[in-house]
Amino acid sequence: AETTAPSVYPLAPGTALKSNSMVTLGCLVKGYFPEPVTVTWNSGALSSGVHTFPAVLQSGLYTLTSSVTVPSSTWPSQTVTCNVAHPASSTKVDKKIVPRNCGGDCKPCICTGSEVSSVFIFPPKPKDVLTITLTPKVTCVVVDISQDDPEVHFSWFVDDVEVHTAQTRPPEEQFNSTFRSVSELPILHQDWLNGRTFRCKVTSAAFPSPIEKTISKPEGRTQVPHVYTMSPTKEEMTQNEVSITCMVKGFYPPDIYVEWQMNGQPQENYKNTPPTMDTDGSYFLYSKLNVKKEKWQQGNTFTCSVLHEGLHNHHTEKSLSHSPGK
């Protein structure tokens, strides 16, 4: 094989660094023949924290990496350079390590998982979809955005047709010095219920390529929920606070909204279990309202209100109250 000089790439972290931390910088020495190469840092002035890994032979050429770990107070405020020598080709290369982002035309760089942005898409809230006076929204969230490149651009598509009605908030800085960006697309109730597909496309200078996420209503035959209410048990009546329970079963899809009223007034002191798949593939959940025992004993009317697309007008409710003598 003929003598081949190496290509040298500086390796830098993908995001800005916290103060009082250590930072690992690297040099990738790629595609040379024959061995050896030597790698020093700042012409040998940096020697502690250096790791030069054994060369790997691939397709007749060698590649190796060398790294150095320095305090973030040292870099990038002070210059760090890797010095590569390949005697066989009389090559000497000095590469200064400069801060850079992962992505775009960036050469290989050291990126840990926590420094790579993630994109998530969320469905509209069932209450918004099933209430004609509310506006359902599909939400796209980007997290772990580098403060070097906090700007991201959202594009939205409904069944592959681009729409321009989304509301995008400015990036918000998080406690870990990364940014978070949120875009919300208001949608038509029937577009979601009819199973149209919503796609969020996110582009950024920090991404090698756009990231896309898609969401739509779960497929399957709609099944109507059955609603049952249960009074507090006799054993529980020894307590100061009692539980009124609503069981909702046999519904599909799992998107559902359950809330409580007392004498027509909304109540807050309740908890719902997540919709859980039953043995027949439909879903069920329990909702538990906690009330003061005297409120129950006074004969107040408690109503479990359910919103689901399988119901007439998307709504049903079941009420119960204490009957003296029970």
Swiss-Prot record:
| PROSITE patterns, per the entry | IG_LIKE (PS50835)
Q: Where is this region: CH3?
A: 220-326
Which residue intervals make up region (CH1)? 1-97
Taxonomic superkingdom: Eukaryota
What do the Gene Ontology cellular component annotations say? immunoglobulin complex, circulating
Question: What are the recorded GO MF terms, alphabetically?
Answer: antigen binding; immunoglobulin receptor binding
Q: Where is this region: Hinge?
A: 98-112
**Region CH2: start and end of each range?**
113-219
InterPro entries listed in its UniProt record: Ig-like_dom, Ig-like_dom_sf, Ig-like_fold, Ig_C1-set, Immune_Resp_Modulators
Task: Please give a single GO biological process term from the UniProt record.
Answer: antibacterial humoral response
Alphabetized Pfam families for the sequence: C1-set (PF07654)
Q: Which residues are glycosylated?
A: 176
Q: Which UniProt keywords apply?
A: Disulfide bond, Glycoprotein, Immunoglobulin domain
Cystine crosslinks: 27-82, 140-200, 246-304
Output this protein's name.
Ig gamma-1 chain C region
